[in-house]
Amino acid sequence: LDACSRRKHVKSAQYDHFAGIARQEREHDAERLFRAMAHAERLQEYNCANAIVRLGGRYAPPEHVTVFRGTTDDNLRRSIDFARRPPEGLHADDIERALQSGNRYAARVLIWARSGDMRHLALMETCRRRLAANGPADARNEIAGRRANNGTAGVPANGTARASGRGTAEGSENSRPDATADNAPKGYLVCPTCGNIYPAGCSDSYCPCCLTDGRRFVAFEE
């Protein structure tokens, strides 16, 4: 539990840092995902730390966290590679050992943490594929600007309201700061109990991991 808590603490700090980079690069889907994952990691760190205390132990988070520096794509790739690494040493069978010892409480908390890791991996892989398909944000915005100009070019001053309105609508739609919004979720929802995470619009009425009412989920949206 202590090792899991410390890993979660480090990852939450990393994801907060990566969210700031994504914001600077105007990769808003990645920013929302990193912020949601950072929140989920903090919840799972708390759950593990609380279990340690309830079982009679003590927990102290790491005093220093080294954060990586790179582009949003680099940060997604690095995070994905780390998440794909199999557990090592005692961490490989920590859930099984907890179950064999009859400590279902510790096992449940560790299962929430492990399932969260797999959920984050899948969401990051999807986010990175979207980012690669759409290209850098600056290039998307440049293309969007050209489309906006083309949509209004050549329209006479007394052109019909329908033609003029159509050009303006296309321009405003494609020149949004977050040009990935056409094929990206509008945000993410995080269960406040176990840290389970969903793309907005694809959540359950109740969290399947801990049965928390979906109306309590924390939203990370535009």
Task: Show which residues each predicted segment covers.
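Non-heme di-metal
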Residues: 1-222
